[in-house]
A protein has these predicted regions:
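Alpha-helical assembly-interface signal, strongest on the long, hydrophobic N-terminal helix that forms
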Residues: 4-121
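Long, compositionally biased low-complexity segments
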Residues: 106-385, 390-393, 418-720
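Residue-level signal for mature regions of secreted extracellular proteins and peptides
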Residues: 383-384, 406-410
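Repeat-associated, polar segments at repeat-unit boundaries in modular proteins
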Residues: 408-422
Length: 720
């Protein structure tokens, strides 16, 4: 560098001196003027002492002046850094509030859904056998959750509005702190930030006016519980009657436990030799139906008719065999006309009356139908009734027409066959009164069937009543839960467009270390800078980060009330951390909770299945949109983007230099600084910690949600 400098000096003096001297006087080289020019610095190709000294002086002058210039520019940059810090700090307050408001909204909605999920599961549990002891408690717990949600929503609405009122001040205060934090021993920085716009357009009416009434749910659930209990009792009676009918038909699979001659199935197998296909067995009354017994009886009597033979060769034995065949034929005819119809709304039946005694025969067609041959004996003076034309008495007499038993009741009997109403009544009298007879168990089946039909029809009536109560309960549930599908709160706080920060610094003089004989001290006057920041979504954050941390804090805070919340916190927590896709989370949870109850059979089971589908449909019909849970982080931007943004109330801000000069140095009161910028703010929140809302706990106590006003960092706290 020195070599180049000397060469430049040499060229300068050479041109200056030689150009002036040579044309006028043509002096010889080495004259006085030549020596006092270039030769003072260069002689015989070498540098002189004078030239070296000049170079050193020039270099030192340049060095110290450059250092002073660099120091001056750095001080100007420091002011911009202070303004940037204020802008980012102010925007961070808005970001923290936005996060807090989102968490509150998520908490209220998810808490409401948790309550309805518990209520809906409880309503279904009322109808599930085995789950009814806890069903009432589940409904009551769900109602308490809804009441908790109502109180939480009201307090949160008031808290959020109060914070928004103070938000411009909080933005200014945080920015003032950030700017002042740049102070050094020699420089003081003063500044603040303005929230743009200053006014709020948030709408919390959806929270404030969203109290959900659960009175109808409570009333209908009580009615449903009573109807379900009555239906449960009726179903038990129906099941008992059905089991008695089943025992009479085919409950004799265990002879050692029930008896040797235990049921129709066993008697049909022993007496009629029916195959397993013709004579099916059912091990349980659950899978058995009464129609099985009717079909078994039809098959049995057809086979007995086909197998019937006289037990001896006498006319009396023949008469008894004919009487049995007549009874079998009559039974088949009657059974063909019998039925049991259960259409799911009413059960009706027709079961034949099979006579067991002579007296009962007189009430049937066996007594009145003219189907028995007659004859006259003793010259036509004696009329007798016979079992058939094969009777010796009939053959020995004169054949007559057919007659009924009633026509000859009380007359003289045929001495050969002695056929009369007693013969018919006696045909099955013993089997009907002792357990080794098929008819004995058939009569047991008929008695049980009559009880079963009566119980079943009563069950149908109670089932309709329970269905009506379930419908009322589902309607009450549907109407109540619709409150959650209303418009969500609109979060549009002051500063939603961004913040504009102003910063000024005090006068400063270069430090002594930079002052010397080669330069004069530099005095910098007051400097100012302006900056702006906006909020940008952070795609790198997981959607449930904030809510997961928030709920973890709540769980820690609720640890002292273990046993009060039971599974409520689990249900709420799952919905809360799934708030990003709240509808999907609610649908999935509702399905799992109802399916977790297990299925139920019978009348209650079908109603429970219907109610479960209806409740799940009500939840699905909410149609809740997915939520954007990305964190908002402050980023610097051009001040014009904020000042001239739509809705800006500082769009008329002009003469920025004048505004900067109006900031009083050393002032740390955010309100005073804002007033200097013609921007009005009010400190509406006092103290260092502000309670945003309180979550009441079932059974007493609450969890406060607080805002740390002192630091304004991570605005939401779980009671800490």
């Amino acid at each position: 560098m020195i070599r180049g400098l000397l060469r430049g000096i040499k060229r300068f003096w050479s041109r200056l001196v030689l150009t002036r001297c040579r044309p006028s006087c043509h002096r010889e080289r080495g004259g006085f003027m030549g020596r006092t020019g270039v030769d003072l610095f260069i002689e015989d190709g070498a540098y002189t002492t004078l030239s070296s000294a000049v170079v050193i002086l020039v270099v030192l002058a340049l060095l110290f002046s450059s250092t002073a210039a660099i120091w001056s520019m750095s001080r100007a940059g420091d002011t911009q850094v202070a303004a940037d810090s204020g802008a980012l700090a102010g925007a961070n307050v808005v970001s923290s509030y936005h996060t807090a408001a989102t968490v509150v909204d998520a908490s209220i909605l998810s808490l409401g859904l948790a309550g309805f999920a518990t209520i809906g599961t409880g309503l279904v549990a009322i109808l599930i056998p085995g789950a009814e002891p806890v069903a009432g408690n589940m409904v009551d717990t769900g109602i308490e959750i809804i009441k908790t949600r109502n109180k939480f929503a009201k307090s949160a609405s008031e808290g959020l509005q109060k914070i928004e009122t103070a938000l411009p001040y909080l933005v200014a205060a945080r920015a003032t702190q950030a700017v002042s934090a740049q102070d050094t021993d020699s420089v003081t920085y003063t500044g603040t930030a303005l929230a743009v716009p200053r006014t709020s357009e948030s709408d919390f009416a959806a929270l404030k006016g969203s109290e959900i009434s659960t009175d109808a749910i409570k009333d209908t659930s009580d009615d449903l519980e009573y109807a379900a209990e009555e239906l449960r009792k009726a179903s038990e009676e129906t099941a008992k009657a059905k089991e008695r009918a089943w025992l009479a038909d085919c409950g004799g699979s265990d002879e050692s436990a029930i008896g040797r001659y235990s049921c129709m199935w066993e008697r049909a197998r022993s007496l009629a030799k029916l195959s397993d296909i013709e004579n099916p067995h059912y091990a349980s009354s659950v899978t058995w139906e009464p129609q099985v017994a009717l079909d078994r009886a039809k098959t049995y009597y057809r086979q007995r008719l086909a197998n019937e033979e006289p037990q001896g060769s006498s006319a009396k034995m023949e008469a008894e065999s004919v009487a049995r065949k007549t009874f079998y034929t009559y039974a088949i005819k009657e059974l063909d006309q019998s039925f049991i119809k259960d259409d799911g709304e009413k059960i009706s039946f027709k079961i034949p009356f099979l006579p067991r005694t002579p007296g009962e025969v007189k009430g049937t067609q066996l007594y009145t139908d003219a189907m028995w041959p007659t004859s006259t004996n003793d010259g036509g003076e004696t009329y007798q009734l016979h079992y058939g034309t094969g009777c010796p008495g009939y053959k020995n007499g004169s054949p007559g027409g057919l007659a009924s038993v009633v026509d000859y009741d009380g007359r003289e009997l045929c001495k050969k066959c002695e056929f009369d109403v007693v013969t018919l009544g006696r045909a099955l009298m013993p089997p009907s009164f002792i357990e080794n007879g098929f008819e004995y168990h058939f009569d047991e089946f008929k008695d049980a069937l009559e009880d079963y039909v009566e119980c079943r029809n009563k069950e149908f009536e109670l089932m309709r009543q329970t269905e009506d109560e379930a419908d009322r309960a589902s309607n009450a549930f549907d109407q109540a839960i619709k409150a959650l599908s209303g418009e969500r709160p609109r979060i549009a706080p002051p500063g939603r467009n961004g913040v504009v920060a102003f910063a000024v610094s005090s006068e400063v003089t270069t430090p002594d270390e930079l002052n010397s004989s080669f330069n004069t001290a530099v005095e910098l006057g007051s400097r100012g800078a302006i900056s702006a920041a906006v909020l940008a979504p952070d795609n790198a954050t997981a959607q449930n980060n904030v809510l997961s941390r928030f709920f973890s804090t709540l769980e820690e805070r609720s640890g002292g009330v273990a046993g009060v919340l039971d599974g409520v916190m689990d249900v709420w927590g799952r919905l809360l951390v799934g708030y990003g896709d709240i509808q999907g989370s609610a649908d999935e949870l509702m399905g799992e909770m109802i399916n977790g109850l297990g299925g139920g059979g019978g009348a209650l089971g079908s109603i429970a299945s219907w109610l479960g589908d209806t409740v799940s449909s009500s939840v699905a019909a909410l149609g809740l949109e997915p939520c954007d849970l990305r964190l908002r982080k402050p980023v610097l931007t051009d001040t014009a983007n904020v000042i001239k943004s739509p809705g800006s109330d500082i769009a008329g801000l002009s003469k920025t230099q004048d505004k900067l000069r109006s900031i009083p140095l050393g002032v740390t009161d955010p309100k005073a600084l804002c007033e200097a910028l013609e921007y009005q703010v009010e400190r509406t929140i006092s103290g260092t910690v502000f309670t945003l809302a309180e979550i009441p706990l079932p059974g007493g106590g609450s969890i406060p949600l607080t805002v740390d006003v002192a630091t304004l960092v991570g605005a939401l706290g779980g009671g800490s």
